[in-house]
Amino acid sequence: MDDLSRFNQVCKKLGGRNLYLVGMMGSGKSRTGPVLAKKLSYGFVDVDDVIEKVTNQSISEIFDQEGEIGFREIETQILQEIGQRHSLVVATGGGIVTRPENWGILHQGVVIWIDLDREIALSRLRSDETPRPLLQKNLDDNFDCLFKERLPIYLESDVHLSVREESPDDVAIGICTNLQLLLLKDEGLDGRQTIEE
């Protein structure tokens, strides 16, 4: 089956369910999301971009003024609004999985964990000028601490894709292949509501 046929089959079987990309900072969710969305004829939303637009503040400014708890409250509100829509690929913030109430929304769609190799993730984060409030000071130790804390939660994802140096296009194809396998399983997403256009 060629890639186009695979994407068409997956899109049909998804029935309008949102795809939520989760993973650590620097894993490529925001780079892969638009590519995957285009291949599936889905819309694309980046949760952090929506938060910044709605609050008219950067993520760092929100952390400075509201702290992590305040930021997570805003993030949950935005996720709830996004969850009312369908046929979206959603790039989430790395910590969105840490709030149990978010999982109720995430599992209305399909949760895809992009698991980037640690050294490559750290290399990307070192060269990225985007302020990362939770990775201030000792990048390696803070990254490892966050990953250890989040790993059991990431493992609850519907799809787990380990990646290294692949292009966003290759990651999107890998996601689609995994989705195809998931959706073809009898137990794959039973009980999840599909949305008919």
From Swiss-Prot:
Q: Give the keywords, sorted.
A: Amino-acid biosynthesis, Aromatic amino acid biosynthesis, ATP-binding, Cytoplasm, Kinase, Magnesium, Metal-binding, Nucleotide-binding, Transferase
Q: What InterPro entries does the record point to?
A: P-loop_NTPase, Shikimate/glucono_kinase, Shikimate_kinase/TSH1, Shikimate_kinase_CS
* Textual note on the cofactor: Binds 1 Mg(2+) ion per subunit.
Q: In which pathway does it act?
A: Metabolic intermediate biosynthesis; chorismate biosynthesis; chorismate from D-erythrose 4-phosphate and phosphoenolpyruvate: step 5/7
Listed binding positions for Mg(2+) are 30
Instruction: Name the Pfam families for this protein.
Output: SKI
What processes does the entry annotate via GO biological process terms?
A: amino acid biosynthetic process; aromatic amino acid family biosynthetic process; chorismate biosynthetic process
Q: Cystine bridges: which residues?
A: none
* EC numbers, comma separated: 2.7.1.71
Keyword Signal on entry: no
Q: Name one GO cellular component term.
A: cytosol
The residues that hold substrate are 48, 72, 94, 150
Functional summary from the UniProt entry: Catalyzes the specific phosphorylation of the 3-hydroxyl group of shikimic acid using ATP as a cosubstrate.
- Protein name, per record: Shikimate kinase
- Give the species this sequence originates from: Prochlorococcus marinus (strain MIT 9211)
